[in-house]
């Protein structure tokens, strides 16, 4: 079986998530990260949104160092739309973090926007202390821009990542 985040063109998109169709596919691009406790860095990223014909999208994210020398981060999960203007992002990180975020969905002027705040952060006994996350996505045509805010290791909710990706 292929990775669940890959688009499933032979299966009809569930009507509850039809508004999220602009996200479908694989997106690649570059980003920049910063945080008060680390040196700033650049990275390459790939995000894939797919579907299984159910009322959610699958989500798979991978990043590598800008020079391609090493993997940096990964996330896997699901994007749900339980109400027309409300979205939920449920993610697992290999660092021992799980993340449930909820937020708003706005579609206007040819753009899809999602703004999330974490409602629950779970962590294993060995994971770093992350207490809050926030994400914003903007999709216009074949471009997706996102930013991520994080409260971790004693720092308040602070800008951490931003990237611009293009659909393959």
Swiss-Prot record:
Disulfide bonds: none annotated. Binds 1 heme b group per subunit, that coordinates a highly solvent-exposed Fe(III) atom. A motif (GXWXGXG) lies at residues 25-31. Keywords: Heme, Iron, Isomerase, Metal-binding. CDD domains: lipocalin_heme-bd-THAP4-like (cd07828). Pathway: Nitrogen metabolism. The keyword Heme applies. Its cofactor is heme b. It comes from the Bacteria. Its EC number is 5.99.-.-. It catalyses: peroxynitrite = nitrate. Heme b binds at residue 160. Homodimer. Forms a 10-stranded antiparallel beta-barrel structure able to accommodate a hydrophobic ligand in its interior. In fact, this fold hosts the heme group, which is located in a wide surface cleft. Belongs to the nitrobindin family. Heme-binding protein able to scavenge peroxynitrite and to protect free L-tyrosine against peroxynitrite-mediated nitration, by acting as a peroxynitrite isomerase that converts peroxynitrite to nitrate. Therefore, this protein likely plays a role in peroxynitrite sensing and in the detoxification of reactive nitrogen and oxygen species (RNS and ROS, respectively). Is able to bind nitric oxide (NO) in vitro, but may act as a sensor of peroxynitrite levels in vivo. This is Peroxynitrite isomerase. It comes from Nocardia farcinica (strain IFM 10152). The lineage of its organism: Bacteria, Bacillati, Actinomycetota, Actinomycetes, Mycobacteriales.
